[in-house]
Regions:
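Small/aliphatic-rich secondary-structure junction motif
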Residues: 2-49, 53, 152
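General small-molecule cofactor/ligand-binding pocket signal
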Residues: 34-36, 80-84, 135
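A short acidic, glycine-rich active-site loop
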Residues: 51-62
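Short helix-capping segments at alpha-helix termini
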Residues: 70-76
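Charged docking surfaces used in two-component/phosphorelay signaling
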Residues: 83-91
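Glycine-rich phosphate-binding loop signature in dinucleotide/nucleotide-binding domains
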Residues: 95-101
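Glycine-rich, Arg-bearing micro-motifs that act as flexible, cationic patches
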Residues: 103-128, 139, 143-147
Length: 152
């Protein structure tokens, strides 16, 4: 796995869960990870305006936070960051292609089918468009185990 693992970071829990899973795999395999925050301020407005700058700042904050956490837990993993001014799915696929990544890791935040259809789902789009394998990781909250019912 010379190209490593590209990870989609969107500022939410599912991207962080994907990053943790990717770091754990990267540590086992001896490959780097690339945290990717793709953003498009507005397809209707001018590029480089205040909205786009604010979204990029959110991306910097999110990737910095998860990078710090990952580096502390997996110091052997090389972690890189790319902020890409493209739609998130396009950004992930482009970075994976440019870096010859072996896989893309994305989170699944539990959007229902209707919300995903209305809002769009980066995970869905990457899974269906990427020529590379895609690892889909549930949000950290999704893998909590419910406590066993109390005995009567």
């Amino acid at each position: 796995m010379s190209g490593g693992i590209v990870v989609g970071i969107g500022g939410g829990g599912s991207g962080f869960a994907a990053a943790r899973t990717a770091a754990r795999l990267a540590s086992s395999l001896g490959v780097p990870i690339v945290l990717v925050f793709g953003y498009e301020a507005s397809p209707l407005g001018p590029r480089g305006g205040p909205l786009e700058e604010r979204i990029a700042a959110i991306g910097e904050e999110a990737t910095s936070q998860i990078r710090t956490e990952l580096a502390a837990q997996w110091p052997d993993v090389r972690i890189e960051v790319e902020l890409v001014g493209q739609r998130p799915a396009d950004a992930l696929i482009a970075v994976a292609e440019a870096r010859s990544a072996e896989t893309i890791a994305v989170g699944h935040g539990g959007l229902g089918p209707l919300r995903a259809a209305l809002l769009g789902s980066v995970t869905y789009e990457v899974v269906h468009r990427s020529p590379r394998p895609v690892l889909v990781v549930p949000d950290d909250d999704d893998d909590e185990v419910a406590p066993a019912p109390a005995s009567a």
